[in-house]
Amino acid sequence: NPDVRWKTVVFHHSIYSTASHASDGDIIDRRNELPQIFDELDIDVVLMGHDHVYTRTYMMDGFTPDRSQGVQSSVTNPTGILYLTANSASGSKYYGITAPEAEYAAVQNQSKRRTVTNVEVTNTSYTMTTYFADDMSVLDTFTIYKTLNTADMESLISQAQGLNQADYTEESWNKLQAALKAAVELKYNANATQSDIDAATTALQEAIDGLVKVGVNTN
């Protein structure tokens, strides 16, 4: 579904890690090819493994890391993709950091401790929190926020709330109140989607346009 709120790619061979596999020929080939494809598909997050070292990139705009704001714990409405490389959950092996100055790496860690990453997704946020598995202390956390566009709906809510009931017929006023109530409830609904917002905005606009003034003959 191309219209889903969040898009995640998961595959094994990390293209943005900081251990020895980062310089493998097949990894370099993937790094030269895949980011463009991911950009075209509007991917938000890429989760990877293989090179057993924790690495979180900056937001990557194509092949270019956005380092303008330094290392952040969250971004809002970003351009680009976040790439995260897992370390090892089993502790079977750990790879040392060989590229500590990699320009794409915002956070890297090799403490030779097992790690796990929890992903929590809502309509407006995508949070990745990585823990040390031995005591569940936090190694790193990062959240991407996407704000919903509610400006048009909020403008119509204000317009509707400023109208005088006495000026309009009961039937048209009741239709307006139903649309207004739905829009206001949606404004504070954490699970609302942009499609929900757009539909409520349209319904409220139609209700306002459909108001009939008292004493006006519509026949």
Regions found by a protein language model. Give the residues of each.
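Beta-rich interaction/scaffold domains
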Residues: 148-219
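Metal-dependent phosphoesterase/phosphodiesterase active-site architecture
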Residues: 1-9, 14-20, 36, 41-45, ...
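Charged helix-capping and loop-helix junction motifs
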Residues: 26-32
